[in-house]
Amino acid sequence: MCIKIYSTLIGVFVVGYLLINHNKYFCSSKIVERYYNKYFFENKTLKDLPDTPLIAINATEVTQNQLMTFSKLKVACGSNYPQGIILPDEIPVSLSVMASSAYPLFSPVTISAEYFADTKKDVEEPVLIDGGIYDNQGLHKLDERKSAYGTDFSIVSNAGNAELNDEGMENVITLLYKVMELLMNRIEKMQMRKALYQPMEPQIEMEKDKRCAYVALMWTPSERAIDGYLNNIQDSLVPRYVYEANGINEEQAERLRQRTMTQEERRQCNEIVKEHIKWAELCENQNRVIEAWARAKNVGTNLKGLKKTEINALVTLAEWQTILQVRLHLPHLIHEQV
């Protein structure tokens, strides 16, 4: 009996040890990278990526707590790995994607010396994990003017739908996973606030503005977006050149900011914005979009395969939300005039 008990305890200890240290003995990221390469990227390297659009893949470099960005232009991260240290031409796309998604159960990804410009130089290999740990929305490199990837205007798609709950909290592995989900959710919200809810001078010129159309697939497709847009004008979150493009004049905007607008006047502003963004046209497919939203919100951002109906739902919802948000927040990018 004692032997059986000891054997069981030893077995539990070994299994627990391997679970905690599985990356040391079982490099899961290498295996997944090989599958990525075989089934998706077919031995393509960064030099095979198109010149336009410029594709940038983010990973978090653990030792520097900074983003390492992979692209056809360069692979760089902070002062330890400036442009030219790592050569992008031969780095597999599969390695870049694996580094960008190495979370939470995959082992960290390293870039070996064979990809360095000087293979004999004593440079520590970067240790990479999911880029979302540092930059959950992929906005960091886009809104920096000195960045090689900086843009004046951007469309951000957030497909996250994680709902935090207390299920499985007694399990230490599940607990750690939920802690990471909480952290990434917090980063996501902070970046969204910076992109959408940062007060500005209404008179800012388009050339000096860095505007973002933020598309959150889990937002309910409804008229609430129009009301929220007016609230943003009220809180000085929308510059003049944007709201004027959607039919709101300066007098109306000032009354919104001063909180002196009557309900009837606000209703009229609502109708003006609707006319300029072609709300009636968007409503033609709204029932189909609501059905797509109901299906899409249950699609997880994990490695589980998607059904064709789920893919179609995501496409339908993303298209509708993108058209709406671009018409509201980036109207000057649309060539056709109402």
Predicted regions and their residues:
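Active-site gating loop/helix substructures
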Residues: 2-147, 167-170, 299, 327
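Well-ordered, non-membrane alpha-helical segments in soluble/globular domains
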Residues: 32-37, 176-177, 192-196
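Short, hinge-like loop/turn segments at secondary-structure boundaries
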Residues: 171-175
